[in-house]
Design a protein with these regions (language model features):
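A contiguous strand-loop segment
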Residues: 3-132, 152-257
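Repeat-unit-sized solenoid/scaffold elements
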Residues: 137, 143, 181-185
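Second-shell loop/turn segments in exported
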Residues: 123-125, 135-142
Length: 257
């Protein structure tokens, strides 16, 4: 196998129930294409429903229905068809569990990232309550490629902010895969999985430095915001080479290094 960059494969947490995602870049896969494997772990009695949602045109002014307290996103004029793996517990759906493959071959799965330091009491870090389930739905409905999905994710998070405390998203197609790890609000770290790499997404933040991978994505204030909140202090003033996203944004008792 080709050289694999040092993606963090460390501890998966202290509980016996953990989602996990494995990603193989196309040069690391025997198929010559990206491979994604995902295990969804949710407690209690869960019904898993599978179905196809056809493409659709929407009237001007349509919005995406959302969980109570979350933002109602404007719907786009046309949405793609997608295969939907839906997890339902009792009579309710699970906002952070469902997976998708759309008609363009874009895959969306996610993992819990435990708790971020951004508290749920900080309503100012999101707009109109922020976005939760509709992030994954919007990706399924709109992404023409995995790279397009990465763009959509960042645009939605930049505008609305992410409502839950911590979550990771994998967005992949046959040629590329992207990992994003989101804190509550508008702060995240993302990376394209190198073609010759095998990557693991556990249940805690494991993206670290600003230049660890050939392609990385983060908001312009990801460092300065952490400094302002007291979550990160550079060893040398003005030098952010020791910045660690996972350490800065993960709740201290859930940081595994």
């Amino acid at each position: 196998m080709a050289n694999t960059p040092a993606f963090d494969l460390d501890a998966f947490g202290n509980t016996p129930m953990n989602c996990m995602t494995l990603i193989a870049g196309k040069a690391a896969s025997a198929t010559g294409h990206v491979l994604v494997g995902h295990n969804e772990d949710d407690g209690g009695h869960v019904v898993v429903r599978h179905g196809w949602v056809p493409p659709r045109d929407w009237e001007k002014g349509a919005v995406m229905p959302a969980e109570d307290g979350c933002a109602l996103l404007p719907q786009v004029a046309h949405t793609l068809g997608y295969y939907w793996v839906e997890y339902r517990k009792d009579v309710m759906g699970l906002s952070n569990a469902d997976g998708f493959v759309n008609e363009r071959g874009v895959v969306i799965v996610s993992n819990s990232m435990g708790t971020s330091r951004e508290g749920m009491e900080n309503a100012d870090c999101v707009k109109d309550g922020g976005i939760a389930f509709n992030l994954r739905r919007a990706l399924a409905e709109r992404a023409q490629t995995a790279r397009d999905g990465a763009r959509i994710l960042m645009e939605l998070i930049d505008e609305w902010g992410y409502a839950p405390s911590g979550r990771a998203y994998t967005i992949a197609d046959r040629d590329e895969a992207f990992m994003f790890q989101l804190a509550r609000g508008r702060h995240y770290m993302g990376a394209r999985v190198p073609d010759d790499a095998i990557a693991v997404m556990p249940n805690h933040f494991n993206l670290h430095g600003l230049t660890d991978y050939p392609e990385q994505f983060y908001p312009a204030d990801v460092v300065t915001y952490a400094i302002a909140r007291g979550w990160y202090t550079p060893a040398k003033n003005g030098d952010f080479s020791d910045f660690d996203f996972a350490k800065a944004y993960q709740a201290e008792d859930e940081f595994f290094g």
